[in-house]
Amino acid sequence: MPYEIKKVFASLPQVERGVSKIVGGDPKGNSFLYTNGKCVILRNIDNPAIADIYTEHAHQVVVAKYAPSGFYIASGDVSGKLRIWDTTQKEHLLKYEYQPFAGKIKDIAWTEDSKRIAVVGEGREKFGAVFLWDSGSSVGEITGHNKVINSVDIKQSRPYRLVTGSDDNCAAFFEGPPFKFKFTISDHGRFVNCVRFSPDGNRFATASADGQIFIYDGKTGEKVCALGGSKAHDGGIYAISWSPDSTHLLSASGDKTSKIWDVNVNSVVNTFTMGSNVLDQQLGCLWQKDHLLSISLSGYINYLDKNNPSKPLRVIKGHSKSIQCLTVHKNGGKSYIYSGSHDGHINYWDSETGENDSFAGKGHTNQVSRMTVDEHGQLVSCSMDDTVRYTNLTLRDYSGQGVVKLDVQPKCLAVGPGGYTVVVCIGQIVLLKDQRKCFSIDNPGYEPEVVAVHPGGETVAVGGADGNVRLYSILGTTLKDEGKLLEAKGPVTDLAFSHDGAFLAVCDASKVVTVFSVADGYSENNVFYGHHAKIVCLAWSPDNEHFASGGMDMMVYVWTLSDPETRVKIQDAHRLHHVSSLAWLDEHTLVTTSHDASVKEWTIAY
């Protein structure tokens, strides 16, 4: 019973206000890479739906850069670990690992022969190191700064030069190898966020939080000019990137614009205004072949259009925070995946192409905990902002209507025919009919965690933290406790009725899935063991013969109802991140989401 990965819809870059985001390009110009959490994400620049995720860092990764040869990538994390790994194979084998200093690595630069690496950041005893890639032997010292170094670059032609930019408002110029400190450049009045040599090595540029960009001679370090005369931008500048022919420079700023500069005549060629919201601040940029990319504070990746500066060619959206829940729905013959994340953001994806967007208008303001689609084709979602929302899936617009405010925080919801929604909250079970609250059980006597409604619409199953499942009946506008207890093997974490209503599957914190037979008075049908840690989600296949479970052990199992031994085990479905939610597109296609903020589609063969 094999499986294979069909599609990966990758996460967006992880961004932080006021901190520049480094986006690296590959030397051949086909792909770009960035980091999110413990992952390094590699994406095809022409078709960003093609993605690969590297997850071998134990800590949050800050920066990753291709070697000029294109065969290796160096990535550095917050603990000061630098990993150099292979790009040619799917396994991304580790070549070398170094710890140049103890503390966050903020930038990496290679020499053009891919033999030496400079690493800078916030170490305890030093802020940078430069060494041979294969032995780790030092090839110089990075000195001259008394605060954290934000950026480093090396001239890509001999004689080598190295330049750094720091929070002490200075840039420093080095000659080598071995690299020795030559002089400090103190033209900026605020933090220096980014320093970059032009591809031909003739010049380098420094960009700072003071809104200025200075151009210098690449060989001597002499100042050539200040772009734009005095100020290049009205806000701090977080990133710069040279054009491949070394004549133009792209800059990204907190004033919510990106600009293209003609360096030879010192003038602005284009100004891209990205919006007026604080989330439109520009924190990163990349110029690769004909593509101009910028990164917004929202995490969105913008493909800029030189011919129409007011509107990007395309904007890549998705999630930059961990995904908590998902659901799938067919609309107009297409299958869509809906995913909700920790920051209240809901995204929808075309399951075939990976084309995606977020809903229009103002939606949830906190973590989306559970989503499902009701009989009217509305997305029903509950969130830690204490609301349940009904969103029309043809309009995909959060309007003022369709919001139900609850007294306490909801954890899970389920919908049934006849306009019913059952919501379990902290210490409360609420029944909604036609988007109105009609009944609640205020002190159920246990802590309800999850809920499912039988496809027939009369029975509601509620799983509790006490390890029991209780059954309720929907009678008009009330819920009646049937007084029946089904015992799970531990605190219930998720439950679901099969689509034909014949079985109820219950998973728990004790790593077990128990299936009850509905027709036989909810007698225990089978028990499924295999997970190594708490199971958090499960979903039935449309064939009602198989169901999938995902857990904190990063594993997904696809079980066969009749035989617990016949199973598909997807190891490391989302490596280093537990699986947060599952759904089936069809009998052989499973969708998984995780705290790594990515969505994956798997083909399952029985």
UniProtKB/Swiss-Prot annotation:
The modification N6-acetyllysine is found at residues 28, 81, 95, 115, 480. Keywords: Acetylation, Actin-binding, Cell junction, Cell projection, Cytoplasm, Cytoskeleton, Phosphoprotein, Repeat, WD repeat. CDD domains: WD40. GO terms for cellular component: anchoring junction; cell projection; cortical actin cytoskeleton; podosome. Pfam families: WD40. GO terms for biological process: actin filament depolymerization; locomotion; sarcomere organization. PANTHER family: WD REPEAT-CONTAINING PROTEIN 1, WD-REPEATCONTAINING PROTEIN WDR1. This is WD repeat-containing protein 1. It comes from Bos taurus. The lineage of its organism: Eukaryota, Metazoa, Chordata, Craniata, Vertebrata. The gene is WDR1.
